[in-house]
Amino acid sequence: MVNVDILTPDTLFNLYNGTLEFHEFCKSVLGMRPGLRKDIRFYLLFGEQHKYYDGSPDGLPADSCTRLKYLQDDQPLDGGVDFGNMLSFVIGQQRGNTYRVLKNIYEIPPGWFRELADRFLRFFAPHSCKELNLYYDRAGNNFARQGEDYARKIKDAIEKDADGVRTGWTVCLMSRRQSNIPQAEEYGFMQELMKEGGKKLPRLLVDAVNCKELVSSIEKAPAGIRYSGTEKIVFKVKKSEKL
C-alpha cells in the first residue's frame, strides 16, 4: 500500500500544490521510483518542453501506426537501434524544423532480431512509404568486423519475414563505416540539440506516451566526470540502461 491509498483528496491536493516538491510527492505519496536530479543527468537540458502527450487518441498508447497523429504516411521513417543486453528501437520523422520521435519498440531476451522486426512490421504495416533509414550504435560496425553483423541482421529481418518472404520494406543502413562518437562529443551535441531558441538544429519532441521507455532512459541516465590531464570530460554512466 502507498500513501495515496490512505490520504484524503484535500490532503493530496495540498501536497501536490506546494507542500512537497514534485519528485518528493511522486516518491512519498505515489510510491514512484524517483528520477535523477536534473543537475546530475547526462541529458541535462531534456525537460517537459521536449515531450508531447497528444500523439495518439485519448492519450493511450497506439496499437498501430494509423493511430499516430503526427506520422507522415507518405514519408520515409528514421529508425535508431541500440545493440546491448536488450534491443531498443526508436522511430521518428522530421517535418520542417521539428523532429518528432514517434514510437519506441524494444525486445528483451530470449527475443532478439526476429521478434524486434516483427513488432515493427506489425505496428507499421499500414504505413504507405515503406522506406526506413536505420541508424545504429556505431559499435554495430565493430560486431561486423568480428563476423557478427548485427545491423545487417536487423535489416534482413525487416526486409524479409520469418519465412523469407519480402515484406515490401527497404532498409538503408546509415551508419556504415562510421566510427564511434566519443561520449564527450555526444554530451555537447545533445546540449546543443536540446537547448531552446536560436539554434540551427531542429526542435526535438518526443511522444511521452508511445516512447515512455525512451523518456525514462533519458531522464535516468546519470552523468559522470573524469579528467584527462586538466581537461574535464563528461561521460554517461550506463547502469540505467542495464536490465
PLM feature spans:
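ATPase catalytic-site recognition across NTP-hydrolyzing enzymes
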Residues: 2-79
